[in-house]
Amino acid sequence: MCGGSIYDVRRGIITVLSKGLLLKKYSNSRIVIQNQGGRYELKGKKAYIWLLARSGFTSRGIEEQRIFSELCKEGVLGQTDMPNSYGMYCLLTSNILCVNRRKGLRFPLRGLEKKIMQWLQDGKRKLTVEELIFLIENDVNPLIYEDDMFGVALSERIYQTRVHVNNALRREMVGAKYRDITVNAILRLLEKNRLYLM
């Protein structure tokens, strides 16, 4: 199961991911973010680390890890002591993926990033990271379910042979062939500010 120490900096390497939506970037040392209805202004090293952590950031430094702990307590950073793709999978599955619908200059997406955004933007229901991995692993086209008004057919497709209890799909997708490439595509979308975590 996913896990890891949250505040124990004596264990060594810590990996973090930013939570919340970047609203305004004045500089690398002053930003305004929104998370769960609240607005936060981060300054100095806190702002710098939050920006670095948008697509994952790993550190051994005691000073950085102290800042990690402070940002975690504020609810704007998630962290794990597993600095690998499994750790990133655990961080992503313990949060909600949200689409950044703010206007601005956006470059077109290709390949897997485009497919993930189609699922998340056009879907009739919210999808978890493990559900996205399942859909990509099974090469399910987002357009097939366009007329599925409430996402019932999609849910049946995902959970057709599974009991939807105790994170069964999350545990199953830990060993999925497409887990790492899907996680990496999601991290790129986070870095491009197309997605954010809650």
Question: Language-model segments: which ranges?
Answer:
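Short, amphipathic alpha-helical interface elements at domain boundaries
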Residues: 3-54
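Long, charge-rich, low-complexity alpha-helical segments
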Residues: 38-198
